[in-house]
Amino acid sequence: VTAFFDIGRGDWTSNKGFSPHLERTADTYIQYFENLSKLDNDMVIFTSSELKPKIEAIRNGKNTVVVALDINKKFQSIKKRIARIQKDNEFISKLETRQLINPEYWSPDYALVCNLKTYFVNRAIELNLVNDDMVAWVDFGYCRSADVTRGLSRWDYPFDRKKVNFFTVKKGLTVKTIHQVFDHMINNRSYIIGGAIVATQKKWKEFYKLVCQCQIKTLRNNIVDDDQGIFIMCYHYNPKLIKLNYLGKNRWFNLFKLFGRKDLITLLRRLKVSLIGK
């Protein structure tokens, strides 16, 4: 399951004062998706009505359901609440100056879309669009180059079925108090990536309830964050539900390299990463 909505990142240009790494047009994301779309796995994709035909054409005959959705209409009130907090001086004053460029702190569209991942997966399950018991969320733009998928034709890795499988880029995540969770959010510390999550349908339903509770708590504390911070809170409240799978230090795109195939080479790669950390 994945999703793409054009939130105007093509206009986040450096000549307008934005950090250069933020600028990505809708066409850039479509190009990234072409790499992911080469997988033969069934896919459910949520997008806007105008992008639906283009995405269907890319998948070209592979088992795919593209669901058109107007997220601005459906999530209008929550988006307004996010925008209010992002403009609130009390919230802004908590952030370090260097964090102010990050879009989760100023773009309501970005914060909203990042926080809808579990909604999209559970909506796909509710609509009976998912044919397998194991379901993965993978970001639409996760595969920025063709070699990210490591030549896989079908992704079918034996993840722990009793857990929600997260993927981490830093070791040592400990969150003993909710204040520590909020501290991670405010300081934008990255442990868990938002780009991929794998679980059974049953665990996704359980996880969705937990995510919603964490999102509500975050907003009530006058804080906005993207999915990474919310997932840290989920880990704080229910660590037994979650398994942390290490990708290597800051190795955000190692998903298919370390958890792609069930062969000896992949096992040895993972062993190396666990020993030397990268």
What is each stretch, according to the model?
Residues 8-11, 52-55, 74-77, 143-148, ...:
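Short catalytic/ligand-binding loop motif for oxyanion handling, primarily in non-cytosolic enzymes
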Residues 1, 44-47, 134-139, 165-168, ...:
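A structural signal for short, well-ordered beta-strand segments and their strand-loop junctions
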